[in-house]
Amino acid sequence: MSGGVQEQFEIKFRLPDGTDIGPKRYPAASTVATLKESIVAQWPKDKEKGPRTVNDLKLINAGKILENNKTLSECKSPICDFSGLTTMHVVVRAPTSDKQSNKIVAKKPKDFRCGCSIM
């Protein structure tokens, strides 16, 4: 890099149904959370079950789930060097309602006890 020009990466996002958002260029200093905000804003309105917040999304690149607080530079590795166009896979977490989350908490594993009977 010379002359203060910041490195940029060209990224497209592959949605669960196989369609794409992008490609678009992002500065190397962009965080994964920033990418997710961009995805939420660009999510096609005609698609059902879209994300409401960045926490509803997971980004996967080169088989790794990317952490929200990491920058693109920090996500680079020998496997994922962001050279050329990079495709990241988007996974949308199914929204859970309060009723569903209460059911999960309410279900406790039953104690398994042995019973002996003398005949």
Curated annotation (Swiss-Prot):
The gene is MUB1. It holds the Pfam family Rad60-SLD_2. GO terms for cellular component: plasma membrane. PROSITE patterns: UBIQUITIN_2. It is found in: Cell membrane. Residues 117-119 form a propeptide. May serve as docking site to facilitate the association of other proteins to the plasma membrane. A lipid is attached at C116 (S-farnesyl cysteine). Residues 9-75 form the Ubiquitin-like domain. This is Membrane-anchored ubiquitin-fold protein 1. SUPFAM superfamilies: Ubiquitin-like. PANTHER family: MEMBRANE-ANCHORED UBIQUITIN-FOLD PROTEIN 2 (PTHR13169:SF26), UBIQUITIN-LIKE PROTEIN 3 HCG-1 PROTEIN (PTHR13169).
